[in-house]
Amino acid sequence: MKKLAILGVTVYSFAQLANAATLNVKSYGTTQNGQKVDLYTMSNNNGVSVSFISFGGVITQILTPDAQGKQNNIVLGFDDLKGYEVTDTKEGIHFGGLIGRYANRIGNAKFSLDGKTYNLEKNNGPNSLHSGNPGFDKRVWQVKPLVSKGETVKASLKLTSPNGDQGFPGKLDVEVIYSLSDQNEFKIEYKAKTDQPTVVNLTNHSYFNLSGAGNNPYGVLDHVVQLNAGRILVTDQNSLPTGEIASVAGTPFDFRMPKAIVKDIRANNQQLAYGYGYDQTWVINQKSQGKLNLAAIVVDPKSKRTMQVLTTEPSVQMYTADHLLGNIVGANGVLYRQADALALETQHFPDSPNQPTFPSTRLNPNQTYNSVTVFKFGVQK
């Protein structure tokens, strides 16, 4: 791996590839408390690139070619650091960020572990959502370029969350590895270790629009989605799981066969009404636990772009961004509205610490938290 400095931009060249891939690094500004933030861009040899910043590990841009070879940015975001640090925090939208310590909701913002109750921030009605503020997506991570045989480019992001942070027990050392391959696979690997028993549930909160943000008047409503899931978690009016797991058969949540989002998103259904659209947890049909399983396939009929999502996690939260109310101006001056994007958050079940029948999210000192999610990009033939 060679390191070059060109016009203030650091370029890491990975020479083992026939057409050397690069990881470009440049300054992205400083936070309000004076921390330096850098922008990293990983590129492969097929015209796909992924950009992220050390602030929150936020994915700021994913460029992929459409069926005609035209590149567009397929994730929502902002033009500058202030957008992610100030506007995003105020609105609670988490564009592109790494979510932790516990993604999604924990009921009544508290849980018990080994007989002790831990209280969290109530930031979503009576519940805790994404562990309150500042979450992992509002902190500066330590980033280090890596290289591995067979992968175009790779970077490690590290963060230490001290004991008691966000109300959770134990010091948590987290490493997230972003990598982009010449198979157009953007992989996110999560690892975490603790010094005392705790609970962990990490994810990434990117908002996708395969047409490119602002390029489709229908947002993602015409996107065709297929989910490898036959069940959902039933929620209450605050989008908190009740503990019931229900079949999707005969409901608007049945995406076992490819279906346009628009077909059922406004159906007369109480669960849809609670989320103002799709904001539910689907239970993935796992062939084997701990291995990559297909979670979702998304196709944009306009650009012919496709995205497959594979994960080791037991569930995926599909969120159609129906809380974007047209009051947020994003990158390139685009006004973000309801259903302008689709989030596919791979994760453990929400509120697992309070739901004994759900898979456990407990992490002990002698264990390592491991999770992998892959976003594979392509075009429809």
Curated annotation (Swiss-Prot):
GO terms for biological process: galactose catabolic process via UDP-galactose, Leloir pathway; glucose metabolic process. One of its GO terms (cellular component) is periplasmic space. The keyword Transmembrane helix does not apply. It is found in: Periplasm. It catalyses: alpha-D-glucose = beta-D-glucose. Substrate binds at residues 105, 279. Keywords: Carbohydrate metabolism, Isomerase, Periplasm, Signal. The keyword Repressor does not apply. Pathway: Carbohydrate metabolism; hexose metabolism. InterPro entries: Ald1_epimerase_CS, Aldose_1-epimerase, Aldose_1/G6P_1-epimerase, Gal_mutarotase_sf_dom, Galactose_mutarotase-like, GH-type_carb-bd. Belongs to the aldose epimerase family. Mutarotase converts alpha-aldose to the beta-anomer. Active on D-glucose. This is Aldose 1-epimerase. The lineage of its organism: Bacteria, Pseudomonadati, Pseudomonadota, Gammaproteobacteria, Moraxellales.
